[in-house]
């Protein structure tokens, strides 16, 4: 399992504006163990994602 910021089809992090429930539901939908809104980046962060999940690994948001 991996941890990280899930991305959309354009390699952009999911913005959350401190909404932990949104991120938790998003991450659970991606089969993660849990998730929360990381306030420093205002982006969802998932813990325990499947190894093949799409997470931010660098590169620009298109």
From Swiss-Prot:
Pfam families: Toxin_3. This neurotoxin acts on sodium and calcium channels. Potently inhibits native voltage-gated T-type calcium channel activity in mouse male germ cells and weakly blocks Cav3.3/CACNA1I channels expressed in Xenopus oocytes. In addition, significantly slows the inactivation of activated recombinant sodium channels (Nav1.5/SCN5A). GO terms for cellular component: extracellular region. Signal peptide: none annotated. It is found in: Secreted. Expressed by the venom gland. Keywords: Calcium channel impairing toxin, Disulfide bond, Ion channel impairing toxin, Neurotoxin, Secreted, Toxin, Voltage-gated calcium channel impairing toxin, Voltage-gated sodium channel impairing toxin. It comes from Parabuthus granulatus (Granulated thick-tailed scorpion). Disulfide bonds join 12-61, 16-37, 23-44, 27-46. This is Kurtoxin-like I. Has the structural arrangement of an alpha-helix connected to antiparallel beta-sheets by disulfide bonds (CS-alpha/beta).
């Amino acid at each position: 399992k991996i941890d990280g910021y899930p991305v959309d089809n354009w390699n952009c992090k999911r913005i959350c504006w401190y909404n932990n429930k949104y991120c938790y539901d998003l991450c659970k939908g991606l089969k993660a163990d849990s998730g929360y809104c990381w306030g420093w980046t205002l982006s969802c962060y998932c813990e325990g994602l499947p190894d093949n999940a799409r997470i931010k690994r660098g590169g620009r948001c298109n």
